[in-house]
């Protein structure tokens, strides 16, 4: 962990608002089609209830110590409206946040939490419409002692996340788009989504079968 005096960073690079808005209109499936596999979080980090609202925004990163949640509780007062708080938790046995912390984060404009760890009071956040993605839930609260970090690179769901990267999460999964590549990825994903939207099921079926049959033939399969 970083020394306390350098542990909290607030001056981070951020994507242009129009880029963030563009990603808010895209499903993770459209984005994952145009990024590498290392940008998609593992399925262990998942929505904590069905039909969860999609979130997309700049990553506000947090690292907590084992059995501790101090830095996440500090982050809710430091994140900007629209930020997605992304957490590398120290373990998955004690909750790093509960109903009140989530409610305050929502009141202050945070888009949602993505936690490589566990959360509690899920029913309250579901009722309030505050999106939570995590490994799971635990009724046990963590301590508030530290150490920890805010806005340093972290690893969440197997993906390295830098402050200011764009994070998109929905029922299908979670994708992290590096800040420097965000405009390029947005353009490709929008084009892919538009093309897919214009393709009828009949046309897709015809193209799909032709590709499958050609691949089978090229590899020597019969039948």
For the regions a protein language model found, what residue spans apply to each?
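Channel- or pocket-lining gating/hinge segments that regulate access to a cavity or pore
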Residues: 173-175
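C-terminal binding/interaction regions
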Residues: 167
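Feature captures the catalytic cores and cofactor-binding loops of soluble hydro-lyases/lyases
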Residues: 2-163, 177-223
